[in-house]
Amino acid sequence: MSKKNLIAGQSGGPTAAINSSLYGVVSEALKHTEEIDHVYGMVNGIEGFLNGTVLDFQKALPGEQLLALTWTPGAYLGSCRYKLPESLEDPVYPKLFQKFEEMNIGWFFYIGGNDSMDTVSKLSRYAEKIGSDIRILGEPKTIDNDLVNTDHTPGFGSAARYVASTVREITLDACVYEKKSVTIIEIMGRHAGWLTGAAALARKYVGDNPLLIYLPETDFDVEEFLQKVNAAFEKNCNVVVCVSEGIHDKDGTFICEYDSAAGTDAFGHKMLAGCGKYLENLVRSRLGVKARSVELNVSQRCSAAMLAGTDQQEGILAGEFGVQAALNGETGKMIAFKRQSDSPYSMKCTLEDVNAICNEEKTVPVEWITEDGSDVTEDFIRYARPLIQGTVNVPVGDDGLPAFVYRK
């Protein structure tokens, strides 16, 4: 059997663990020299591939240099927000597959979130339509943890660890004065509140801050919010509140839109930011207390200092498992995680039909949110805590800073 080449790409927002999945794919592929010749990377995803920007991993990261991917945040290959046309009759598809043929590609891997799985779905369906034998698989990635048919996704654990740690640090900072104050922390999450829920992991004891946590899975009422903040002063004169960027009222209007309209991205998703600042001003004007807001922003997804060992190892495992599955002939699938136990925590990799995953969204179960919508339950804590475990020792360079790997 003649050898073929494998190509991998990254797409969407980066995470602290997306390069671990890339490492898993590349390192496993390099072991199978009897079947796989070259291992290529698409620079800036499908968009870059269409423009002819490709690298050869054996040349770009030879030998032990490849390992540095496992502690490097961001997306080593670069990313894109390119949306493939809905119609498989569009000329971009034969163009892509002609390029695959020219490069002798036998296996295609795309590492990303929901929109990336949409790409995997379209490419695998087109391959089936034309009778191509290219095996096309998706590697999950998203800090939002909103991919369906998987217990969780690589990237979420590290982002959740960052959120919990940062909320604990902000709480310590907020509580230095014996004077009423409210600190509102705005956390990523448009429709799914997994990351914001992780703020509950910051608590050291019952009644500790954050005293209020609001997710987008439930309706947000401004007046009820003000009442709860006022009541929270009975527990602590310094109240920390965590809110998802996508909290909305009963009519579906985002709270951030109370001040201004939100724009949209290439996939039609609203770009949200600003609910924390709105609530800060509201608390200050209505309750007459010191108030401030903190937007965690992109730091949630790029902190190598908070890279969770569990997250890193599962990212690598997913990459390795995917290559093994592809070599066994699997295609049109996404690598998924199936939890086997909470304590001690254990999981295994499985394969799921990517067509049942793309364009769907997994939200926090309503039964994991308190009835009044201002906190998460113990079930959420039990689910999330194992995912933030483990410390990764990131090598330090001569300049005293993390020794990340950079694409040249």
Residue ranges and their predicted role:
Residues 2-9, 69-82, 141-151, 178-181, ...:
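Gly-rich Lys/Arg/Thr-decorated short loops/hinges at beta-loop-alpha junctions or inter-strand turns
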Residues 1-54:
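N-terminal phosphate-binding or glycine-rich loops at protein starts, especially the Walker A/P-loop
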Residues 52-106, 115, 156, 168:
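Glycine-rich oxoanion-binding loops at beta->alpha junctions
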Residues 99, 107-112, 118-133, 153-292:
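Accessory alpha-helical/coil subdomains and C-terminal extensions
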Residues 257-408:
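C-terminal non-catalytic interaction/assembly regions of soluble proteins
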Residues 5-15, 75-81, 106-112, 138, ...:
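Short glycine-rich or small-residue beta-strand-to-loop segments that form or flank ligand, phosphate
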Residues 15-25, 49-50, 93-94, 114-122, ...:
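Short glycine/serine/threonine-rich phosphate/pyrophosphate-binding segments
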Residues 44-47, 141-145, 187-192, 216-222, ...:
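Glycine-rich beta-alpha junction loops
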